[in-house]
Amino acid sequence: MNVRRVESISAQLEEASSTGGFLYTQNSTKRSIKERLMKLLPCSAAKTSSPAVQNSVEDELEMATVRHRPEALELLEAQSKFTKKELQILYRGFKNECPSGVVNEDTFKEIYSQFFPQGDSTTYAHFLFNAFDTDHNGAVSFEDFIKGLSILLRGTVQEKLNWAFNLYDINKDGYITKEEMLDIMKAIYDMMGKCTYPVLKEDAPRQHVETFFQKMDKNKDGVVTIDEFIESCQKDENIMRSMQLFENVI
């Protein structure tokens, strides 16, 4: 597997999901995030493609021979916040990595693990995969990828928070329980490994969850609704500042 091509997609997902998962590190500066995010879309600006290559990409998009046929480019452009040219570039990279036209969970986990060798990203990648797999068919298509990426990179704060809520709502019942949030937090800590908590206690994820629930569970009924989640996040300066990073870099 071509690591450079994998990095162009996976780094986007890692940074974006980290924001949605309220993962903060001292090194998460605007510059470092920008450098990683720019690897996917604007990378094409540094390389001048010949007309023949550009036409080839267009032909691939409209006459794909892969097992999964993508939706028409015009439809995806209308459903996302990417331009036609950006979609062409994204599809070209997606197809190079996934000739079948879809990514299954095992491949997704393999890609994700390459960026967290210091930890175990398996569980978090599972949750993230399910968030992208909106129709729950066990595969992430190019359409799934684009719609999720469009929200994470160019969506409104409301759209990003809705996406984050869906990530935490593991069983998709419309509520976040402490157990669900704890599962996500443990997965994040496991993924970051020693880089995140060399001196923290084992119960750090649980303490993190307790703090969040004190803020979010307004009526103290033991679950967090989408309204409680969004309201609490919008009042949290750290979360909102993290969201704004993406608005400034793309």
UniProtKB/Swiss-Prot annotation:
Q: Which CDD domains match?
A: EFh
Q: GO: which molecular function terms?
A: calcium ion binding; potassium channel activity; potassium channel regulator activity
Q: Where is this region: KIS?
A: 2-44
Question: Segment Interaction with KCND2: which positions?
Answer: 237-250
Cite the binding residues for Ca(2+) 2. Answer: 169, 171, 173, 175, 180
Q: Name one GO cellular component term.
A: peroxisome
**Which residue ranges run through the membrane?**
none
Key words, A-Z: Calcium, Cell membrane, Cytoplasm, Ion channel, Ion transport, Membrane, Metal-binding, Peroxisome, Phosphoprotein, Potassium, Potassium channel, Potassium transport, Repeat, Transport, Voltage-gated channel
List residues binding Ca(2+) 1. Answer: 133, 135, 137, 144
Looking up PANTHER family in the UniProt record yields: CALCIUM BINDING PROTEINS (PTHR23055), KV CHANNEL-INTERACTING PROTEIN 4 (PTHR23055:SF30)
In the record's own words, the domains note is: The KIS (K-channel inactivation suppressor) domain is required for converting A-type Kv4 current to a slowly inactivating delayed rectifier potassium current.
**How is the quaternary structure described?**
Component of heteromultimeric potassium channels. Identified in potassium channel complexes containing KCND1, KCND2, KCND3, KCNIP1, KCNIP2, KCNIP3, KCNIP4, DPP6 and DPP10. Interacts with KCND2. Interacts with KCND3. Interacts with the C-terminus of PSEN2 and probably PSEN1.
Family label: Belongs to the recoverin family.
This chain belongs to the protein called Kv channel-interacting protein 4
